[in-house]
Amino acid sequence: MPLRRCRAWRGHSQPGTGSRSNEIPKHRNVVAFLDDFSHVVCRGPTEQRVIIAAVGKLVDRIAQTGKVAGDQVAVFVATERFKQVKPSDQAGLRDADGLEQAGKLAVDVLQLELLDWLTESINGGSDFCLIILKIGEVDPMALILAKFVDSASPLKPAVLIHRAPAF
């Protein structure tokens, strides 16, 4: 299957921010972050396109603009049909089991902020959703996950092929 270029997110809604110290970046910050990964390609049918975005120096930028801690990695899950996923299936995006099996990582998903952000994104018809994962001492630049969402999820990616760019 040919590689596809993933479009930068141009959502219509302003994602809400969390009430705790680790807030989901505002719309303008997320767009700026995604623009830096305009070269990223992914494999699979349109409805299953998934990006694992590496961080590096960009984590520092989001830490300054979006109040995301420097020891967290921003993971972008992209699908044009995400807004059609049932709420019961969206839980798969917050399930750390796949990540733990793939990389034995200590993952802490900021569930409250994530749910608020997903609601705003789905209602706005956005193509991209943001998940913040705490990965502890693991080097984000070396993070390559073979499996992200649960196999029962309609968002299961065909292949995750993103590798962190060199800075």
UniProtKB/Swiss-Prot annotation:
Keywords: Plasmid. Residues 1-10 have a biased composition (Basic residues). It comes from the Bacteria. Residues 1-23 are annotated as: Disordered. This is Uncharacterized protein y4lJ. It comes from Sinorhizobium fredii (strain NBRC 101917 / NGR234).
